[in-house]
UniProtKB/Swiss-Prot annotation:
Major site of localization recorded for this protein: host cell
GO cellular component, one term: host cell mitochondrion
Protein name: PB2-S1
Domain of life according to the entry: Viruses
Function comment: May participate in the inhibition of type I interferon induction through inhibition of the host mitochondrial antiviral signaling protein MAVS. The knockout of PB2-S1 has no detectable effects on laboratory infected mice.
Keywords: Host cytoplasm, Host mitochondrion
Location of the protein in the cell: Host mitochondrion; Host cytoplasm, Host cytosol
Amino acid sequence: MERIKELRDLMSQSRTREILTKTTVDHMAIIKKYTSGRQEKNPALRMKWMMAMKYPITADKRIMEMIPERNEQGQTLWSKTNDAGSDRVMVSPLAVTWWNRNGPTTSAVHYPKIYKTYFEKVERLKHGTFGPVHFRNQVKIRRRVDINPGHADLSAKEAQDVIMEVVFPNEVGARILTSESQLTITKEKKEELQDCKISPLMVAYMLERELVRKTRFLPVAGGTSSVYIEVLHLTQGTCWEQMYTPGGEVRNDDVDQSLIIAARNIVRRATVSADPLASLLEMCHSTQIGGIRMVDILRQNPTEEQAVDICKAAMGLRISSSFSFGGFTFKRTSGSSVKREEEVLTGNLQTLKIRVHEGYEEFTMVGRRATAILRKATRRLIQLIVSGRDEQSIAEAIIVAMVFSQEDCMIKAVRGDLNFVNRANQRLNPMHQLLRHFQKDAKVLFQNWGIEPIDNVMGMIGILPDMTPSTEMSMRGVRVSKMGVDEYSSTERVPLHQSKVECSSPL
């Protein structure tokens, strides 16, 4: 309040006003800042002062024949004085209004075809159902998601060739349309866009939207298919979520879903054949999804799912270094380890042969209802930061992390024999035996883990062996974060701060 009063007093003095309005800006650093480079430094300000001028627009001389000098109200639409430095005409914003109302009209037949993705979005929203709104803590995880519903999954290069062929067919340049989908789309679009008067550049932009998968790395708490991502801002905030059912499906989400189902079936069949790799590759090559060869889809499609990754790896494609354990996707974000077989004794004196990971590693763990950051050394959990929807989800994540850490106190917490089998009645491997055991009852595990006093860190809280929260004590190395924990994209490396326990998220 004092500051405002002081400013008011200053502004009431005529000298202040004079200094602010009359003095020139002659400081070289300021001039340099606003004049170096072609990039506009303050677009909003520029637009404001341009629009305050009488003729902020320049146009080609032909405008003088097409637009009257004055409108019906007698306001001048363009000035006879030339734009300094070019032979263009200075034009008023009112001329745009005149043109929109009285300018030539053209056939609208191509608009729904060019702006197809927008029209389809409107339809999906019109037929979608919204509500109710729930207020609760949202656990969001950054995931790589598809933000462009309805696209045909072409690669950027394939799409570029199609666009050039459709929009600029006479331009020189080698364009080889090889894939089935490229040829079909090109033929379809050429027919649709005959005699199209919309600017070629606009057509090219819209075609790109229609042909290429665009992905972003966004915090998501619910559905990750593109029809949910397009309404992300309507369905989830920091402390609320709104239920939403999309008013239609799109081809790319169907393909993603079908790809997962096909890959799972293929992997299942291949595992029981005499030569799993050869049989898997043969099936991938002979399978089609929506009329497109599965191998072509696998090359383009970024869906991260276990069976899909197995098929990609078999084809020699790059996959992200993630793996599943206990219903969580683990992604190593830093560190490395070597595997070594080791025999350990459980609390029941049963001998287990486990493959020990030697070395320091950091992982993100992503499950359906909880996420975590795990830092571990050889058979030792250093730190676990968990975030989850409820006590049950947090407990699940803690159990998985404790088992994954391979700590001795976890193995010693086993009571009774480990003899879990899978559906085919085969014994599970030792790590899964341990996991099943503690998923049934984790009381001894939590009690034996040990507790420690904790520092008061914002957004973080301790958790006791009986799963009650505490601000003073916590199970050793374990903290609960009120914010979500981010999943990493396979392409994005994010530096982790290894300094202190007190970082709730590595970003």
